[in-house]
Each structure stands twice: as structure tokens, then as C-alpha cells.
Swiss-Prot record:
Entry's transmembrane regions: 255-275, 284-304, 308-328, 370-390
Keyword annotations from UniProtKB, A to Z: Cell membrane, Membrane, Transmembrane, Transmembrane helix
Pfam families: TraB_PrgY_gumN
Principal localisation: membrane
Protein topology in the membrane: Multi-pass membrane protein
Coiled-coil stretches noted in the UniProt entry, renumbered to this chain: none
Protein name: Uncharacterized protein MJ1365
Locations listed in the record: Cell membrane
Source organism, top-level taxon: Archaea
One Gene Ontology cellular component annotation held by this UniProt entry: plasma membrane
Database matches in InterPro entries: TraB/PrgY/GumN_fam, TraB_bac, TraB_PrgY-like
């Protein structure tokens, strides 16, 4: 049986409430069957599910929220979007190996609530907030590791058998410990913060109720129980803090971006002034700046199998945009928008990324191609900038 049932009685300051936590594997057929049995036997006054508004809508309508790709490009949220796709793709592939759709046990809980006229409560944090906080907290090394995993993922990496899936549910602490070791940041944002968020939501919902059932992933059960006990003992959890995308960090990031850009501009202008009396040196500096920033940015577009017109635009714009510290003026944004103009993006492209079985399939997907063009053109220009700066500093030395 791929399921965990934990019962905890909580005094919420108003009354005592029995909370039954059903910990499931989100891709297990057994989970669906057991959810109905447990809910029927417990007869709760409400059912809570590990969903937010967006995922609830997607689950009950089988429709995905439309992606505003222009907004993704203009805001530079390429990696955040990639991570969302990785999570969706991974869960879907694992589910397919067991002949079950991800989230089916949540859908079953919703159907049971409707059948018995019970209120349904969405207790998880908004997925966009979770991913934004993850991006703010992750180090550059962690972000690059995820991007590398995307490019090198293999279908075999996602293969699970029944024994392993049972072990994941019965002993989630082993896998939580492994996640902590791989990336403490991912564990804290994707697991621990959401444990706190859902525990607080359940604690508040339990007021004036005798019993509740909550259907959550097995990896969240112990954390939710732990935080429910802390809440019972007077240790409050600030939900506003957990949904805040820290602007202070964004300001610091923006300040750092401006600082790096101003340093680059200062070195570049100093080299221009230094070479004013030496026309040959001035030509060489200008030529190298255009060649390496523009050339490597255009190469990034071509490596992403972008359009020739996009590569030309990247070549012409990179020498200028690398000196402008604005996201909207970044060569990746410009290249991505140009590529988007020549590639029709449909809902099938989003579904295609999630369903992709290989890198070849991804590279034939228009949506993925646009995002890759934006990412690699930015990367190429950045490599060109630092190569030129190294050469310029060498001249001064």
C-alpha cells in the first residue's frame, strides 16, 4: 500500500480537532483507492488538498494556464520557467510508468468532497511564489546544476518500480535527507517552507471543526505534524513571511547587476580613452569587443538552432546591450523576442515540452527553442564580455 495515514489531535485555542493526514505518492494507483476508503471511514467535516488555485483549476478542467512567453522573456525568468517544466515533466513520466496521471489522488479527494457535500480547502502555497522564492535563494552553482540536469536527463533516470515507490512513501525521511544533502535550498523552499505553510492553514481551518482530512505528498506528512505541534504549543507561523518574494534581495541583485555593468562600462571607456592617441589600438579594441560579444552571442543563437535573422540581430545588438544594465535591453531578451516573432507558439508546444522523451524532441519544440535562444545568446555575450575585459586588463598591465 503506497500511502501513509497519520492522525494528530490538535488544540487550536478554540477546540480540539482530529486531523487525518493522508500521505500519498502523487503518481500511485494505490493512493487513489486508499484515499476514498480513508475519507469514507473518517467522515470529516472538510477535506484539504495539497493544491493552490492554479493547480486546482488545471486539475479539474484539464487545462493549463496559458504561458505569456513575452513576459517570461522580458522579465528574464528563463530558468524559473525551465524548473517548472522539469518538475511537471518528471512527475508526468513517473506517473506514466505506473499508468496513472499525476495528481489523480487529489482529484479523487475533490470528487469525494463534492459527492458528500464537504468543503474542499486548498492549503498549498502558490506555485509561482514558491518558484520565485526558490530562484531568489538558489546560488548560481545550484541554478547551473539544474540547467545541466535538464540537458542531460535520461528517461532511465526517472524509472521507478513498485518497491522503490513503496519505500519512498514508507520511509520519506531517507529521501528528504538525500534532498537536503543535494541542495539545502531546494529542500528548504520546496519542502520545509511548504510544510509550515500547510500546517498553519490546517491549524486555522481546524477551528470550530471536529475533524479534517488532508491529502498531501508523503514527504510532507512528518513536517506538517511537527509544525502542528509547535503551533499548538504557541509557536506561531507567519504566512505573510512565507508568501513574500523578498524585494530586498531583488534590490540587492539589481544593485549588483548595475555595479557589474558600471565596472564593465568603466573598463571599456578607460580603454577607449587609453587608446585615443593610438588609432590601431582603438580599432583593435573596438573590433574585438564587437567580434567576441556579438560573435559569441550569435553563436549561442545558432547552437540553439535559432533563425539566421535572430543570430544577426544578436550579433548587432550584443556589443551595445552588454553595456546597458537593463533586463529589457539584454541581448537574450531581444534575441528571444525576435525568435518568437518567427515561431508560432501554441498550447501544443507547452504540452510537448512536458511530454518530451529526449533532447531531440525538445530541440524540435518551438517554445523550448525560443527559451534556449534567449539563454544561450545571453551566455555567449557574457563570455565575450569577460574575455574582452581580460584582454583589456592585460593591455593595461
Amino acid at each position: 500500500m503506497v500511502i501513509i495515514l497519520r492522525h494528530v489531535r490538535v488544540f487550536n485555542g478554540v477546540n480540539e480537532c482530529d486531523i487525518y493526514l493522508i500521505g500519498t505518492a502523487h503518481v500511485s494507483k494505490d493512493s487513489i483507492e486508499e484515499v476514498e476508503k480513508i475519507i469514507s471511514s473518517v467522515s470529516p467535516e472538510g477535506i484539504a488538498v495539497e493544491l493552490d488555485d492554479r493547480r486546482f483549476f488545471s486539475l479539474i478542467t484539464n487545462e493549463e494556464k496559458k504561458v505569456d512567453l513575452k513576459k517570461v522573456l522580458k522579465e528574464g525568468n528563463f530558468l524559473k520557467f525551465f524548473i517548472y517544466l522539469i518538475l511537471a515533466n518528471s512527475q508526468k513520466k513517473i506517473g506514466e510508468s505506473f499508468g496513472i496521471k499525476p495528481g489523480s489522488e487529489m482529484k479523487k479527494a475533490i470528487e469525494i468532497a463534492s459527492k458528500y457535500g464537504l468543503p474542499i480547502y486548498l492549503i498549498d502555497r502558490d506555485i509561482d511564489i514558491t518558484l520565485s522564492r526558490l530562484m531568489d535563494r538558489m546560488t548560481f552553482k545550484e541554478k547551473m546544476k539544474i540547467f545541466w540536469e535538464l540537458l542531460n536527463s535520461d528517461e532511465e533516470d526517472l524509472e521507478l518500480d513498485d518497491d522503490l515507490l513503496n519505500d519512498m512513501v514508507k520511509n520519506p525521511e531517507k529521501f528528504i535527507k538525500l534532498l537536503k544533502e543535494i541542495s539545502p535550498t531546494i529542500y528548504e523552499v520546496l519542502v520545509d517552507e511548504r510544510d509550515r505553510f500547510m500546517a498553519k492553514r490546517l491549524f486555522e481551518l481546524s477551528k470550530n471543526k471536529n475533524s479534517l482530512v488532508a491529502v498531501v505528498g508523503a514527504g510532507h506528512v512528518e513536517g506538517i505534524v511537527r509544525y502542528l505541534k509547535k503551533l499548538e504549543n504557541g509557536n506561531d507561523i507567519d504566512l505573510m513571511e512565507l508568501i513574500k518574494v523578498k524585494k530586498r534581495k531583488k534590490s540587492l541583485k539589481k544593485l549588483l547587476t548595475y555595479g557589474i555593468s558600471l565596472t564593465i562600462i568603466s573598463i571599456f571607456l578607460y580603454m577607449i580613452c587609453y587608446a585615443l592617441n593610438n588609432p590601431e589600438l582603438l580599432k583593435m579594441i573596438t573590433f574585438q569587443w564587437i567580434l567576441f560579444t556579438g560573435g559569441l552571442s550569435a553563436l549561442g543563437v545558432l547552437l540553439a538552432r535559432g533563425k539566421l535573422i535572430t543570430a544577426l540581430v544578436a550579433f548587432l545588438s550584443a556589443p551595445i546591450t552588454t553595456l546597458v544594465p537593463l533586463p529589457l535591453a539584454a541581448v537574450g531578451t531581444i534575441a528571444g523576442l525576435v525568435e518568437l516573432k518567427y515561431r508560432e507558439i501554441t498550447d501544443k508546444d507547452l504540452v510537448g515540452i512536458i511530454n518530451a522523451e529526449s533532447i531531440k524532441e525538445l530541440l524540435n519544440n518551438n517554445l523550448f527553442r525560443v527559451l534556449l535562444v534567449a539563454t544561450l545568446s545571453n551566455l555567449g555575450a557574457s563570455i565575450g564580455v569577460f574575455y574582452c575585459l581580460g584582454k583589456f586588463i592585460g593591455f593595461l598591465g
